[in-house]
Each structure stands twice: as C-alpha cells, then as structure tokens.
C-alpha cells in the first residue's frame, strides 16, 4: 500500500511538473483568463478529411529516432520518482492498472491509474500524436514533424533548432501538406520570429520526381532556425516531415554528384558529375557536348556551358534558328535584392524593368530592377530609384520611355493606395502625378494598359482589382494621359465580374483586352477562383464573354505570341471545406487561340527544378516569354525563358497550318511562306475565323450560368434570353416567352441584372436602384414601382421629367399635383440621371422634333444670389452656366444643353418644353457599416459579425472574402473573428503558458521563487526591444536584443522554450522546485491560480483577490468575474442589486430585499429545482388583504424543512423603507404552517394598505414550496343568497323557454317538409284508365253480352311491401232518385278503398274471344281479397 501511495504521489508530481512547464497551444473550446484571448473560427463550411492516396506522407523515421527525439525534449525525472513509478507498476497496483486503448507515441507513456497517455512537453492528444507547444532541438541532425496522421485543428507549434553561430544548416522538406493560404509553417534564420523570414510554406508540396530532386530545401546561415506552425479551424491535412542537417550538401547534390569536404574550410560541397554544374549539381552543362563541332562548343568557364554557333540555339545547341519547336531554359541568380513576388515588369527596348514587389526582408531591397534581355544580366541603377515607398500588387504600363505605376499595397502600412507615379527611364527618377479629378478607386491586384483609341486619345485603362472600401471592382477606370483626369467608364455588353490577381493582355490586332481568371467574390460570403475569359473592345467599350479555360487560378501571368495568349503558373487552390489536391503553386502552361476561341494545354517546363509558382511576372521580347520571380513558399529570383516555335521555320503549307498549339501561323499563298498572326492580312484573318467557326464546339451547359440578358447575349457560346433565364440557341423559349438573341435588344439599365454583381455595401449604395441586404450579405434590386409609374428612384428621391409646355409657375403647380416640387439638382447622381434621361428622350423617334429645355427648381433670389427650391445655394460645380449666362432678364433656371451640363436663365412667365419634378422616396437607404479596412482595433473589427477578420501580427482588419487577397504570401500569422481578440502585445498575457503560446513572446521570472514574472517580446537569447518607426529612422525598424529587461545577474530567469517549474503566481514559495508550499493572499489551487471562496479576481502573476460585493444577499461569487450567486429568490444582478420585476418581485435589495407579490385567494407553487436555483436559501412574499371586513387566512408547506418569519406593517413602503414591521410569527425547522389574521385585531378598516411579509429561509436546494392567502365570509348573507338564487332560477327559466321555442320551430319546419314530400310522392304514383259499365233499367238487355251481375271487380289494386296486403279501390254506386238519376248536387258514384289480404288470392286469367266484341269469361267463384 505504501508503494501504491508513493506511486500516486509521484504521478501527481509528474503531472504537475508537466503542466507547469509545458507551453501547449490553444485548443478548440479552451477558455483563457480575461487578460488573454483565443483565436476564432474561420467563416464558411468546414469538414475534416484525409488526403488522397497520391499525397500520402513519407514513411516515419525509424523507431530509434522518436526515442532519441523525446529524450532531447524531456528532462529526465528524478531517480526517486523513477523508482517509485517502477515500484508502482510492478507492485500490488499492477492488479488495478489500466491499459491505454491506443499506444502512446512521441515519448508519451500510459498512466496505469487512469488508462490515459501522459504526454511529454510539447505534445498533446489522446495518444500524444499532435504537436502543441515549443521544442528545442540541439542535435547536429534530426527531424521536425507535427506528428503521425493529420495535424490538429487550431494549433500552434514552434521548433528551435540550435546549432553553432554562423554554421550553415539545411532543412529538407520531404513531405508537406497543409491547407493552402491558411495553414503556414514559417522558417526564420535565427532564434525568434524577429529574425529574417526566409520561407512561408503552405499547401501541397510533394516531390514530382522519383529521384526526389525537386523537394524544397531551405538554407539557414545563422546557426539557429525557428520554425513556427499555425493551423486554423478549417480542414486539416497530413502535415509535414522535415529533416535538418548541419553538414549536408545542398539538395544532396541532386543525385548528380558527391558531397565532399571543402579544402578551404570545414564546409562540404558538391563535386558534380559530367554535364552538370551548379551549387547542387542542378544545372545541365554542355549536354550532348553542345553538338560539337557542328552546332556549338562547350565553354567550361561559362555557367551556361554551351556557346552555340550561328543558326543554333537551345539546350545543347540542338534547336535551329528560327526555332521549329518551343523550349524552356532557366537562368538562376543569387543576388539578395532580387527575390520578390507580386511585382510588375515591362519591356522597353531590350531592357526588362521590374518595379516593386513583396519581399520577406527589406535590408537589401531595391524598388526598381533592370534586366538586359540580350546579355541576360542585371544592370546597376542609381539609388534614386528607391525613393518610392515599397509596394506590391500594383500595375505598370509603358508609354514613350515612361513607366506609369498605379495603386498597389504599401508594404510598410498595409494600406492600398491610389497614387499614380511615373518613372522616367532616361534619368531613373520618379514623379508623383496629381490628376485633376480624383474619381478613381484605390485598388490592388489589378492590371493596366496604355492604348491609343480610334479617336486618337491615349489613355491608361485600369482593369478590376480589389478595393478595401468597395470590395472587388468590376469597372474599368480610365486615365487620360493628356488631360491628366480620371473617369470610370460606362461599359456595354456582358456584366463581367471583377476580381483580384487576374491576367490581362492587349492585342493590337483586335484592339481588345483579354482578361483571364482571378480571385473573385460572387457575393459577400461566396468567393472562389475563376476560369473566366473576357474580351474588352477598347473603342466600343464592349465586354464579351469568351470560352473559359476550365483551369481556375489567380496571380498567374499571360502574354500574346502570334495570335495566341500564353498563360503560365498561378495559385490553383480552390478548396474551402476539403482538399481535392489543388496545389498552391502551379506550373500549368496553357494557350488560348484568339482567332478560334479555343484553349489548349501545353507541356510543363522540364528543367530539373521545381518551377511551380504564383505572383511572378511575364514579358514578351522577340517572341520569347521571360518569367521572373514569384512565390512557392520561398521568394524566387530566377528567370524562366520560353522560346516558342517560329512560323518562318516552316517551309510547307501543311507544316505551317499544323504549327502549334502555342502559336498561330498562316500560309501566304502569294509569297509561299509561313507568316505569323500579326503579319496576316484581313482576308487571311477572316478566312481563318470562318474556318474555326465551322469547326467550333459549343458548351450549351454554360448558358445556364448567365443570370442576365446582357451576359447571355454577349458571349461566344450562342445563347439567347427567354424572359428570365438563358438557354442555348438550339432550345426554343416556352410559349409566352420572348426570345432575345442580340445584346442590343436587351432591356437597358435593369437593376435585377447588375445589382447582384456588387459585393460590398458601399459599392451597392453607389447605385440608386440597389439596396444592401445585411442579413444575407448581398446586393438586391429595389422594387420597380417604389416611386410609381413614370418616376425613377435616384438616391433618396423620385424624379420625373415631363414634356408639357408651360411656364415656371404652372410647371411648379403640375409637380405639386403629384406631391412633388421642381427638382433641386444638388447631387452628382441627380445630375447624371437627368442628363442621361434627357439624351435618351431627345434621341427617341417620338420626340425627335421636340427640343426639351426643362425647368428645374433654380431661382434668383436677389441681384446675384441663385438658390434651389430646397433653399440650398447654387454652386457652379455640378452644372455650369452657359456663356454669357445668367442673363439679367431671367429669374428662373432651365437646362439648355444636356450634353454640356449647361444652364440658362429664362423669363419665368415664358412657356417652355419640359420640367423636372422631384419628391422624397418612400424608401430610405440603409446605412452601411464602417468598412473593415477602416477599423483600427480588434474589438471594433470583430464586434459586429463575421464579415471582418483581424490579423493580430499585421494589426489589420480585412473583409472575410478578401483574406486571401490581403495576405497572399502568408503575412498573417494568426487571425480572429466574432468578438475574440488577443492582447495587443506580449505584456497582456498573465501566465507563462499563455505567454509561450505566442511565437514572439518569452517569460521573464522574477527572483522571488514564487512563479511571478512578466511576458515580454523576445528570442531564445533574451528579451528584445521593439523600436518605433520614428526612433528607428527607417521604414522597416528591426527589434534589438535587450538583456537588461531580464538580467540574469539580478537572479531573473528568461524562459523561451518551457515555463519554469515553479508556477505559484507570486502567492507562495516553491518547495522541491515545483510544489507551492502554502497559497497566501486569499488564493487557492495547485498553482495558487484562483481566489478562495467568497473572493474574486485574477490572482495569476501576482494579481489580487477582493471580497465579493453582493449587498448582503450572497456570500459566494464567481472567483474570476465576481458575479454574485444571490441566495434570495427574486434578487438578481452581478452584485445582487436588482429585483426580478418582470417576475412580480418588488423591493429594494440595496436597503432590504425582494418580495414576490401574492394574490388573495390564489395558491402559488414555487419549484426551485433547476441548476440555476442551487444557491437559493431564502424567498420572501408579500400580501395585502382585499376585503376590510374579512379575516385573512394563510397556509404554507414545503418539501423540506425551513424557517418562517411573518411580520406586518401599515403599508408596503412602511415595512421595506422605514422598517416599521411588527413580528407576528417566528418558526424554525418546519415543513407546514397555517394561520388566520383577524380583521378586527389588525384593524383592516383603519389600515387599508396593511401588508403582511412572509420570510422563508434556511432551506436547501432543491425544494418545492406552496403558499396561499385567502379571505372567506363567516356567516351566510341571506339577501345575497336569495338574489343569487332567483337570478339563477329566472335565467334557467328563460333559457328553457328559448330552447322550447326553438324546438317547436324546428318541429313545425320538419312537419311541413314531411307533408310536402308526401304530396310529391302521391303525385308521382302510377295511373291508368279503366272502363266502367253502368247498368240502367232502360237499357236493352241485348246490348251487353253475358251477365254483368257478378262479383264487383276493383278499379285499382296497390300492393304493399311484401305482397301480402294491398289497398283495394272500387266504385260504389250511391242511392239514386227516380229514373236512376242522383239527387241534384250529389254524385252517383264514389270510390271506396280498403286494406285487404292478398296472400291467398288466386290469379285471374283473362282471355279474348274471337270476334269484334270482347266479353269477360266467367271465373271460378273466388273473392278478390279479404279485408283486414
């Protein structure tokens, strides 16, 4: 048993030591102290997944390596503790030991007491399978991994590799797979994140060759390397496996040489095999001996190797001049000022000018570079080229030895600029232009081209881009070089969607721009890459949608070679919730045939190097494409050269026509030679287009993607518009729908088409017909009839232009008839709308003969003062007076020249054609929230919703749909959303564990041996001082090591990898280095990290605890926030300072308590059983009698014992405010109580507001309480009884009479209906005629044959149901007078009927005798029936 206890104690100490010294990363759901904050989830759908098999990670290291690795990371336990653990495992506790369900990895061990893995410092997870802290590696070689399997969501891990100063270290990335653009591994050449950044790895980086020669490798020269990994809350992948070595040749000599020690130093270097050169033997050298002696000669001193003879070129001088096939070459340069991305380049003569770009470090930065394309060398430039602040994502355009640079993101501030600067090539100087009208968007990720229009004007067209204030821009901005003015063009054709990082080229033959791809937002919360291809005609300002490439990408490049647009590289990652293998960095090579509207995929470069990249530049010189720089986790400085095949290399028509893809050649029959697309005649070009048109294949499924008439009819896929949807041209519209096949036939300015193209609130608000819907984060069209028929919504006003001829006063009266007034054109929107409408009305056929000069609400008030109808003064900015205007004769204003915005002063009584009316709109435009880019603090950025994201290290707030566009190169190390913000700097973290979660922070422990310390920005060597820009004197200040902030001589201790063992937060001394001896200062806990019961505060790092402030209604409160756990039901508030008025509690808890108001003659039940009720020990009630002449009875019972006190006062305020309560009852430890309060004893009549107070206390949770107050009469009130009795009796009688009357009416109605049915039934009986022979005494006996004096026969026999009875009817002769005549007024005959039995009746047979006279034959004597 002793061994078991010792083992348990040792285990507890080990766990405590691990907890105290570890620096685990923040995890999902973890709650930090108030002084810290955790990251938030990224918006959007997320799902966990595994990488496809083709991306399976490399094999794990041998079993010995993890063991050695864990030994390097973990301090060995003391021998006594190790012995105790061994005794515990092998002793009697072994019978109760639990085995872990899964094996522990990375040095973790199974705790036999809990069956869970105990992880070493830096590892987390059920199996210790995830990294989650900081590691320090000191071996001369080793590996870095996030652990087996997929890495953990929302994690931060840091590795410090420590070597010898200035010793070269190489990191080799054998396997790497993270979420592109979101999960990054940063590599610093030093011992902190303040050291130079040399790589930011993200995405899928898998060697593409069996020889593993293209695996990324990073070289560190300082002797230290810091690797920091951050993953967000989206999906996770297999992570990484990185090996490092201090004595290793670069890239293992690429497998083409041997690694040998250098003679001059202890370093190693490659001894390359034949035909290979370079530091890592990765440059082909004199392949095929350069074709000597026919094609070239090998030059051993030249790194390129071959010196080709005339008419030969390419690798090994194997390709003739002109080239009959395309080929790639690569030029590598090591100058530190060269690597960059998102720069721009133009060609002037034979010089490629490279301007701007993003760089990791700016110590050797150069704003402008010049590259000689002939000699392929970088040229020196004057220092004046660096006078401009560094930027990236800008645009460049060349015109007459001047380079125009517009927009871009300023790297030092993170702001997007709208500066327009010109670089003069001849003197290498910059000039800032100040355009007259600053009506342009500040954009980044756009493109620009300077073109000469058909009118002769030279303009710079700026295409798309992203603006932090207005989102993704879909318009074309135009800068007039001669007028020095900006304007936003109103384009025609398809409604295109603008984006960030597209490519664009200008084709001089077609006078059009071709724009491909980009990162686009289709609404505020829907964003992705695009594969669209647009054509923009610069003269007609017409957009056309061409065939898409089916290859989604952004930050790629494009050039035009002989009628073909070549597209190279880019970021192709388009996954948001799971990985489909799309790579961050691409070397895809595609060609688009302009004449045939056809895409082709070209072979990727075969250069023995990983040439995948994005953010590079590409220019064209002598039909050769030069690709420079870019980003592939590293910033690149090489130049890729693509030489395309030449048309004039083909000698036959068949070879000429078959050339490509990647080039368009035409056969000239007159000269019998092959010419390029640029030299073709118009007839040859049209012939080629017609041939392509006949062979084209249409993708009818693409028609469904167009949601507006303009895009449906302005594309090359043969679609037509059917009322509200787009269908292929071979599909007919349904009945009743109108087919529109041409763009010109589409209804113009329909807001239903273009509003949903706007991706931000501000861009939506610019259009008066659109409205931003904040809930769905989308722009919608306003209803068409919001202003009424004939009226148009412009801003917050409704405008209407009439054509009636009338004077000013009559025009004003006509407007008033519509609750309007003459328009005050005081805004740009109103002016542009009125002028546009006037031009349309004037150009229409119905009004071609009528000249409109409409009245506007502008009048002269005095000699020189003009003002609008809304009393605002007239300014000459939006509308101008015509020459020699205003004249003295006119006092009212008219629009005379809509094309020139001209005004005239006219005589008010003269009738003129037209007037402009204005009235307020019923619609009020919703105000947009502050744009994310203008929010300067994290709390402001993340407070409202998930539309903004805060980047903590960059101190920037960006739109959620623009995160990738804002930080394309991993600049943001951690982001936050939805009201989760970190401290502004390291000093805001109160504990060592939280401090070391931040990669730029370290912990300085004071000498008190209590665990108290402070979090400071620092490195492994010690604290650093963060300089301000003003004191540093440059744009990019660097932190400096400052050991005085944590002096070891003063017994301060600096911790950067692990926290100190003593973590008592300054409230206790440590014994055995890690155990808190006795927590003082009202603290408790293993590390004295919480306040004792009844006190609250943050005692971490020396914080204070203070008593709970509960106004006497609680003794306990939340130890962190101080929120009181109120003990009286009905009292609420953080300090128990309020009553639950909404639940019928009243009172003043600051001076007394709260009472529940009871109603008389009602029973109340209170069930205090919820978790929120666990702290209640008391509840109070108050009741006031309703009747002054009746006694008040009360009873109370409960499910548990309680104490009861009852008092009374003359009124409620008298009892609660002045304390005039009189005790009545005091009981303890009871479950039930009943009592009655006499109205005479307590004098209810003289105390009409008498109040009884009931105090129930000292009960335990849970409990159920029932209470009631009632007032009942003591004797019978006879008058009241009889009044009540007779009232009820008479009421009952009245009800009975009414019911009887209703019954009678119903019965009479039913009787009438029954009689009517009987009459109808009798009327519908069958009938027939009978012959009746009447005998008279005078008749001769021979007239009737036979004897008629027989038994009478019936005239009718009506059988009853069952045929056993019948109604028999016979004629009866009544008595007659003399002569056989009945008396006057009487009938001689009567019909008699009787009910007879016919069950025994025999049938009567009738026979006919031959002859003309019928006679009835004598029948056997039988009765026809018997009466019943």
From Swiss-Prot:
Propeptide residue intervals: 23-82
Residue ranges of every copy of the C-type lectin domain listed in the record: 794-918
Cytoplasmic compartment segments: 1300-1428
Record GO terms (molecular function): carbohydrate binding; signaling receptor activity
Disulfide topology: 100-110, 104-117, 119-128, 131-157, 249-259, 253-270, 272-281, 815-917, 1062-1070, 1064-1076, 1079-1088, 1091-1105, 1108-1117, 1110-1124, 1126-1136, 1139-1154
Keywords in alphabetical order: Cell membrane, Disulfide bond, EGF-like domain, Glycoprotein, Inflammatory response, Kelch repeat, Laminin EGF-like domain, Lectin, Membrane, Receptor, Repeat, Signal, Transmembrane, Transmembrane helix
Subunit structure: Monomer and homotrimer.
Protein name, as recorded: Attractin
Gene: Atrn
């Amino acid at each position: 048993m002793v061994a078991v206890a010792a083992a348990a104690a040792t285990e507890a100490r080990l766990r405590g030591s691990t907890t105290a010294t570890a620096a685990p990363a923040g995890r999902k759901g973890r709650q930090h102290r108030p002084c810290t904050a955790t990251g938030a989830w990224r918006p959007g759908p997320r799902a966990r997944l595994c990488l496809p098999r083709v991306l399976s990670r490399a094999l794990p290291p041998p079993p010995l390596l993890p063991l050695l690795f864990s030994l390097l990371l973990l301090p060995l336990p003391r021998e006594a503790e190790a012995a105790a653990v061994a005794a515990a495992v092998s002793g009697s506790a072994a019978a109760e030991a639990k085995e872990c369900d899964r094996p522990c990895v990375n040095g973790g061990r199974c705790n036999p007491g809990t069956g869970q893995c105990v992880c070493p410092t830096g590892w987390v997870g059920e199996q210790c399978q995830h990294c989650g802290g900081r590691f320090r590696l000191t071996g001369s070689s080793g590996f870095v991994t996030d652990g087996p399997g997929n890495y953990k969501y929302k994690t931060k891990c840091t590795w410090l590799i420590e070597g010898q100063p200035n010793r070269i270290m190489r990191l080799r990335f054998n396997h790497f797979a993270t979420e592109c653009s979101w999960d990054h591994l940063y590599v610093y050449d030093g011992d902190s994140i303040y050291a130079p950044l040399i790589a930011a790895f993200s995405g899928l980086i898998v060697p593409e060759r069996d020889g593993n020669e293209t695996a990324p490798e990073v070289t560190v020269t300082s002797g230290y390397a810091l690797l920091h990994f951050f993953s967000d809350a989206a999906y996770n992948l297999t992570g990484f496996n990185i090996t490092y070595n201090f004595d290793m040749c670069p890239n293992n000599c690429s497998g083409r040489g041997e690694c040998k020690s250098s003679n001059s130093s202890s370093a190693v270097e490659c001894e390359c095999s034949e035909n290979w050169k370079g530091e890592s033997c990765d440059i082909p050298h004199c392949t095929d001996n350069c074709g000597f002696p026919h094609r070239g000669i090998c030059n051993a001193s030249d790194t390129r190797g071959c010196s080709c003879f005339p008419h030969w070129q390419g690798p090994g001088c194997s390709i003739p001049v002109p080239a009959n096939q395309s080929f790639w070459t690569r030029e590598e340069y090591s100058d530190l000022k060269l690597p960059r991305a998102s720069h721009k380049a133009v060609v002037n003569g034979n010089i490629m000018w490279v301007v701007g770009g993003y760089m990791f470090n700016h110590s050797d930065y150069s704003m402008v570079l010049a590259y000689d394309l002939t000699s392929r060398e970088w040229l020196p430039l004057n220092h004046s080229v660096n006078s401009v602040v560094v930027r990236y994502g800008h645009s460049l355009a060349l015109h007459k030895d001047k380079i125009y640079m517009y927009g871009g993101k300023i790297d030092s501030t993170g702001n997007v600029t709208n500066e327009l600067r010109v670089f003069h090539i001849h003197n290498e100087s910059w000039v800032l232009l100040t355009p007259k009208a600053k009506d342009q968007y500040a954009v980044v990720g756009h493109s620009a081209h300077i073109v000469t229009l058909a009118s002769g004007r030279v303009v710079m067209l700026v295409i798309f881009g992203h603006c932090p204030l207005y989102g993704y821009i879909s318009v074309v901005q135009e800068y007039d070089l001669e007028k020095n003015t900006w304007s936003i063009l109103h384009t025609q054709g398809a409604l295109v969607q603008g984006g960030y990082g597209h490519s664009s080229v200008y084709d001089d033959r077609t006078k059009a721009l071709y724009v491909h791809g980009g990162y686009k937002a289709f609404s505020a919360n829907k964003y992705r890459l695009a594969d669209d291809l647009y054509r923009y005609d610069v003269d007609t300002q017409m957009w056309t949608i061409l065939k898409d490439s089916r290859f989604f990408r952004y930050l790629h490049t494009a050039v035009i070679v002989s009628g073909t647009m070549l597209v190279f590289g880019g970021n192709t990652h388009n996954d948001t919730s799971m990985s489909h293998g799309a790579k961050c960095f691409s070397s895809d090579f595609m060609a688009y045939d302009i004449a045939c509207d056809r895409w082709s995929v070209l072979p990727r470069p075969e250069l023995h190097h990983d040439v995948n990249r994005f953010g590079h530049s590409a220019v064209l010189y002598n039909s050769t494409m030069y690709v420079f720089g870019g980003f592939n986790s590293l910033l690149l400085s090489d130049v890729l050269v693509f030489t395309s095949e030449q048309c004039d290399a083909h000698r036959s028509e068949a070879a000429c026509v078959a050339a490509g893809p990647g080039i368009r050649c035409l056969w000239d029959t007159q000269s019998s030679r092959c010419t390029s697309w640029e030299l073709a005649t118009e007839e040859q070009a049209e012939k080629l287009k017609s041939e392509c048109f006949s062979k084209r294949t249409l993708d009818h499924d693409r028609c469904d993607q167009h949601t507006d008439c303009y895009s449906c009819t302005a594309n090359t896929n043969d679609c037509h518009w059917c009322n509200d949807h787009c269908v292929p041209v071979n599909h007919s519209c349904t009945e009743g729908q109108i087919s529109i096949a041409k763009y010109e036939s589409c209804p113009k300015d329909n807001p239903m088409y273009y509003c949903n193209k706007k991706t931000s609130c501000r861009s939506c608000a610019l259009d008066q017909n659109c409205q931003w819907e904040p809930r769905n984060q989308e722009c919608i069209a306003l209803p068409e009839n919001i202003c009424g028929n004939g009226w148009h919504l412009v801003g917050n006003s409704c405008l209407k232009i009439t054509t009636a001829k009338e004077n000013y006063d009559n025009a004003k009266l006509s407007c008033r008839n519509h609750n309007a007034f003459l328009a005050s054109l005081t805004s740009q929107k109103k002016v542009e709308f009125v002028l546009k409408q006037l031009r349309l009305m004037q150009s229409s056929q119905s009004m071609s003969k009528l000249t409109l000069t409409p009245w506007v609400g502008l009048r002269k008030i005095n000699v020189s003062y003009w003002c609008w109808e809304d009393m605002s003064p007239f300014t000459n900015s939006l509308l101008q007076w015509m020459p020699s205007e205003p004249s003295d004769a006119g006092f009212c204003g008219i629009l005379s020249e809509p094309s020139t915005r001209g005004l005239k002063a006219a005589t008010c009584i003269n009738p003129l054609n037209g007037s402009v009316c204005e009235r307020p709109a019923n619609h009020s435009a919703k105000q947009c929230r502050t744009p994310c880019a203008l929010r300067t603090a994290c709390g402001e950025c993340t407070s409202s919703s998930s539309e903004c994201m805060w980047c903590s290290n960059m101190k920037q707030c960006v739109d959620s749909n623009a995160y990738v566009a804002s930080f394309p190169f991993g600049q943001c190390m951690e982001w936050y959303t939805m009201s989760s913000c970190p401290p502004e700097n390291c000093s805001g973290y109160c504990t060592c564990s939280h401090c070391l979660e931040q990669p730029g922070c370290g912990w300085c422990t004071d000498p008190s041996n209590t665990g108290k310390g402070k979090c400071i920005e620092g490195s492994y060597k010690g604290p650093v001082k963060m300089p301000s820009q003003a004191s540093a004197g440059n744009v990019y200040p660097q932190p400096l090591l400052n050991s005085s902030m944590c002096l070891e001589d003063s017994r301060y201790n600096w911790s950067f990898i692990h926290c100190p063992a003593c973590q008592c937060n300054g409230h206790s001394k440590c014994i055995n280095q890690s155990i808190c001896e006795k927590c003082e200062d009202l603290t408790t806990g293993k590390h004295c990290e919480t306040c004792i019961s009844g006190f609250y505060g943050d005692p971490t790092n020396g914080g204070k605890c203070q008593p709970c402030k509960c106004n006497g209604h609680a003794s306990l409160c939340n130890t962190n926030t101080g929120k009181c756990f109120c003990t009286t039901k009905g009292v609420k508030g953080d300090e128990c300072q309020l009553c639950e008025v909404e639940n019928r509690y009243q009172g003043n808890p600051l001076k007394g308590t709260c009472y529940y108001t009871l109603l008389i003659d009602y029973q109340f039940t209170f069930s205090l059983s919820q978790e929120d009720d666990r702290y209640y020990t008391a509840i109070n009630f108050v009741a006031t009698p309703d009747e002054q002449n009746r006694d008040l009875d009360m009873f109370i019972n409960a499910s548990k014992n309680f104490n009861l006190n009852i008092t009374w006062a003359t009124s409620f305020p008298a009892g609660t405010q002045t304390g005039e309560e009189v005790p009545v009852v005091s009981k303890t430890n009871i479950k039930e109580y009943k009592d009655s309060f006499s109205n005479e004893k307590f004098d209810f009549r003289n105390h009409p507001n008498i109040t009884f107070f009931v105090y129930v206390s000292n009960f335990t949770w849970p409990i159920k309480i029932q209470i009631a107050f009632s007032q009942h009469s003591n004797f019978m009130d006879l008058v009241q009884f009889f009044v009540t009795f007779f009232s009820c009796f008479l009421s009952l009688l009245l009800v009975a009479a009414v019911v009887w009357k209703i019954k009678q009416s119903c019965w009479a109605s039913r009787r009438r209906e029954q009689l009517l049915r009987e009459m109808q039934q009798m009327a519908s009986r069958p009938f027939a005629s009978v012959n009746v022979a009447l005998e008279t005494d005078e008749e001769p006996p021979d007239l009737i044959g036979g004897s008629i004096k027989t038994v009478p026969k019936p005239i009718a026999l009506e059988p009853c149901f069952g045929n056993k009875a019948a109604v028999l009817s016979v004629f009866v002769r009544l008595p007659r007078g003399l002569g056989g005549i009945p008396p006057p007024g009487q009938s001689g005959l009567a019909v008699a009927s009787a009910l007879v039995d016919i069950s025994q009746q025999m049938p009567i047979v009738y026979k006919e005798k031959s002859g003309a006279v019928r006679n009835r034959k004598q029948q056997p004597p039988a009765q026809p029936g018997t009466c019943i």
